[in-house]
From Swiss-Prot:
Catalytic activity reported: DNA(n) + a 2'-deoxyribonucleoside 5'-triphosphate = DNA(n+1) + diphosphate
CDD domains for this protein: DNA_polB_B1_exo
Record-listed E.C. numbers: 2.7.7.7
Full protein name: DNA polymerase 1
Amino acid sequence: MARQITLFDFTLKKEQNKDESRKEEIPHANINEERRKPKEWIKEAEEGKSYFLLQVDYDGKKSKAICKLYDKETKKIYILYDNTGHKPYFLTDIDPEKVNKIPKVVRDPSFDHLETVIKIDPYSGNKIKLTKIVVKDPLAVRRMRNSVPKAYEAHIKYFNNYIYDLGLIPGLPYVVKKGKLEQLRPELKGEEVDEIRKAFADSDEMTKEAVNDWIPIFESEVPDVKRVAIDIEVYTPIKGRIPDPEKAEFPIISISLAGNDGTKRVLVLLREDVNSQITKHDVIVETFKSERELIRRFFDIILDYPIILTFNGDDFDIPYIYYRALKLNFTPEEIPFDIINDEGKYLAGIHIDLYKFFFNRAIRNYAFEGKYNEYNLDAVATALLGMSKVKLDTLISFLDLDKLIEYNSRDAEITLKLTTFNNNLVWKLIILLARISKMGLEELTRTEVSTWIKNLYYWEHRRRNWLIPLKEEILTRSSQIKTAAIIKGKRYKGAVVIDPPAGVFFNVVVLDFASLYPSIIRNWNISYETVDVENCKNKEYVRDETGEVLHYICKDKPGITAVITGLLRDFRVKVYKKKAKSQNISEEQRSVYDVVQRAMKVFINATYGVFGAENFPLYAPAVAESVTAIGRYVITTTVNYCRSIGLQVLYGDTDSMFLWNPSKEKLEEIIKFVKGKFGLDLEVDKVYKFVAFSGLKKNYLGVYPDGKTDIKGMLAKKRNTPEFIKKEFNEVKQLVTTINSPDDIPKIRDQLEYKIKEIYEKLRHKGYNLDELAFRVMLSKPLESYTKNTPQHVKAALQLRSYGVMVLPRDIIMFVKVKSKDGVKPVQLAKLSEIDVDKYIDAVRSTFEQILKAFGLIGANLLQLLSILSLT
């Protein structure tokens, strides 16, 4: 404890004494004090110069939209204020005369004026007249929208509204002409354009027109923007406690920076209570006797960078720096950061919190194919980079400076490399996603894929001058759901699943419908304004797997969802997947095209899930139900055809079928059948040496010819499974991969039985340590929010808090199961002697019985194996 007091006294108290005279001259820093104007941090863009648009914000002091532009020559951010006179607004369907009689609108201090505008009804294609209520302040829209019967386009952030109206696309290059942004189109060779147009030769006219607008999105240069990753280390007096950023009561002891310009730098505080000897490092080390001077130096360095990268910087690094600087008597005008809506804003450029980007499920599942299961820096970096954080055996507070520098610099290095590895894959992906979604970098990297898709479709509505319909109007105009859900919590029947047998099957081929739901949306012209609409001449009926008619789709005109989804799918499949594999271009260009197709994959695969979600603003129940019904019809029809030609379908789930020992000729026949009947692409996705089915849906272990495994649904794959189970399961998995024929099964069965006994004995004799026994579960919300029930990890977190440990949302809680009232204890408070062995035996049984059931059908005495785990 003496060490803790010494350090605290040495930093904060000395800083306070040193700055007493400064306090007399400079008023105490107030968070609400007027901040330095943005243009003092960033220079304005010049007429005639070209830039990349990265972000659009709103400057409340000037009451104008502000574009943040990157100059790849100077490597700096510049700003361009709106000079079109654009103002915030929303629409209503009542006449201006009636609006003028609503005092809460026209007497509001922010009311500006009314206009009459013409929009197109997405359903009928007819022109409709609306009143545009123009205001001076975006917040006024929120106040006024409830004062009119129907307020259209009144829940859109102002900077997004600005992007829609001006047709801007963040991530693309522009030139400043007469104070406005004019898009620069890439120069393509004639054969490249011909190749793209050929891919869309059979498309409708709306799609063909859209193709020309989308080419720059995929073909324009992706700038390698100058950026720096930062990471701070803060003194912590108690093990496990995360310092509160808003209180910022403990000193910052080091800040590391790693830039894509080669910068590697650590700013470190010299302290009397730790070994301050510094040996040679591969980073530049700057030492400071004063924490205030360390922070001031940090501010000076980062102003040279237009982009700052952090990992969880919104929640910790940026707010801690900001509030700590205020506490050390920096004025707000001296601090190039601000905290707005719980986001850490970098006033001299753009701040990207990579934690939130990698936390996005669409990025994890579609862009990186589930390579990481946890979202902390160490887990993501290990999975994607093969690098990990420096391991520590003591508190950061007590590290000697040498170890602190190594630890701190590694974190910044890893954070930067997450955007630079594999030819800047992640950075390019962010830019491409910004272009597709029409979102600025800061909002894109902090929001879910549903927001990206919503933004894309709103932008497309505005480009066509379509009125963006109200959610309640879509629900009213959409017909009712006709099917009952099988899964609890769903409103309509979902995908068809063919129950798998329990057993081991050799030579299994998996056929996959390429992007099934997006392809159905495109091929059947499904969109909220095409399903069950009135006054339709050309109808196509939607039938489910039983032949029952559920809905009809209007083919009079292309639906917007069908056009955009089909366009992205065809760009990916027909153009960029091929380019990413082409040997006629450079490796660098291939990597760019690979990023392009990955970005489209994210949108394509997420489309149905988003449009089928009830909270999505363009959700129509009949649309979601039509897609799944057609999917069931396609799968059922295909399975029946397979069986009619002698193919045995072992298992089927949503968009795939597992076929047992099919011939090449039969595979070609079924692929041809699907293409001819449905216009869908059926592909060979996987070929297994064998598959072990447990008999449960979405639950199997497949082994490829090269010995690699593919595990689905088994508990040992779950990220909260204790390490000892994962380790033992991996050993079992290695045993199973040695199987080459049914003749190998008896030997493996004996080895499995021995392994089960070994695990049991090790548990009974406390052969595993606490870390190996720990369950790891992320805390998804503040502890106070758990009011209805208290999950086990929350019980453990509450115990930690009772010992003074700060526990925050997104913390990973490590706990073990013990014999006590709560039944659990956090690892930090538990003893090995307290472990409830029976609970762990249950966990082992539930994990291993899934794989043992597969072998039970070919001779293994399953009941005997499982009964071993019931012995007491």
